[in-house]
């Protein structure tokens, strides 16, 4: 069996991250013979961290044979440590009255 690939995903509990994680764990992204370790980053906010824990439980419940491990954190250094691939998908949606430049400034913080 191949060595696991470490995949860091930002915004892991968001809509885009959530949709990607199950595809990565099932082998749709890297192949049906490539084990993965998911390193999941979410904002240091109670609601986001609770959602991340829920996503991780769902992934565990699926018992994907290629999912060799998971780390959930709000620390970027932990999430990106030894990562082979990084998917930066966390973002804040545009709110009412926001211009694109406002959105860029807000997402830069993330």
UniProtKB/Swiss-Prot annotation:
Annotated residues for binding of substrate: 94, 100
Q: Name one GO molecular function term.
A: L-malate dehydrogenase (NAD+) activity
The residues that hold NAD(+) are 11-17, 107
InterPro entries with a match to the protein in the record: Lactate/malate_DH_N, Malate_DH_type2, NAD(P)-bd_dom_sf
**Keywords tagged on the record:** NAD, Oxidoreductase, Tricarboxylic acid cycle
Its GO biological process annotations read: malate metabolic process; tricarboxylic acid cycle
EC nos? 1.1.1.37
What family does the database annotate?
Answer: Belongs to the LDH/MDH superfamily. MDH type 2 family.
Q: Which PANTHER family match?
A: MALATE DEHYDROGENASE
Q: What is this protein called?
A: Malate dehydrogenase
List the gene name.
mdh
